[in-house]
Amino acid sequence: MAEWSTVTATPDGNIAYTISLENADKNQCDVSDPAPTTRSTGTRLIISGIDGICEDDVSFAQLEDTMLKAFAWYLYLNKDKKIVLTINGTELDYRKYINTDASVEKEILISRIPFKIALIVWNEKITENFSVYFLDEEGVVRSKDTTTFNRNTVNFNHSVFVTSPFFLGRDGITLKGKRVELDGQTALNEYDEDKKVLKELSKEIQDVIEESLHKHMAAQVDKAIARMEARDS
């Protein structure tokens, strides 16, 4: 059985509800009626009664890497909101996967539209290297593209996350402006304006990546010099 106990915020205060999934019927879940609560927002998942799985199989040591690969970026983007993930009471540390010193966040305005660019530099290569994700203000990923450094050979492993109200209702966006799908009919002049915004956004993203890349390469040179000096001493 799996049970999600969630507390979420509403304009009238926090409410709590549970979602239960029985082993016998994995296609149907039970959702409780929401009830007012004074508890803090968050979700707790409890897994029990699964045949063939012991406590060690769901220990922190077994699940840490899997969870960080999936959620390190989310924890980093929401660090100011104090959002955390814990396994059996132990908190996941996104810094194991993310180089926080090299990662960059920048807020800009394009045509009076706010954009927040977050360049995440990974400590090691991951599956989703060199991708750009476009998120709306609710944190929902609306589109995905690749950066211009997706074939770099300098071990600069990175992803870019851009958050803006601009992406709400605009799925399938690419930085090259080849594909923009809007909800409903879109006038030609509005489409042209979107392309202008994306062109400027692409330049801003490029500048952020290049600045961080230059610092990364300088740091690699310093490390190489230090290693040579250590060998010669």
Role assignments for model-derived ranges:
Residues 18-25, 91-129:
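A broadly used, surface-exposed interaction patch
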Residues 114-233:
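GHKL/Bergerat-fold ATPase module
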Residues 84-96, 222-233:
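Amphipathic alpha-helical surface "interface" segments used
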Residues 1-93:
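GHKL-type ATPase core
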Residues 85, 108, 134:
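Short aromatic-centered micro-motifs
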Residues 1, 34-38, 74-77, 107-110, ...:
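A general structural signal for short secondary-structure junctions and capping/turn motifs
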Residues 21-26, 37, 63-68, 104-106, ...:
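Short, low-complexity, polar/charged sequence segments that are solvent-exposed and flexible
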Residues 8-10, 51-53, 73, 91-93, ...:
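Short loop/turn segments at secondary-structure transitions that flank enzyme active sites
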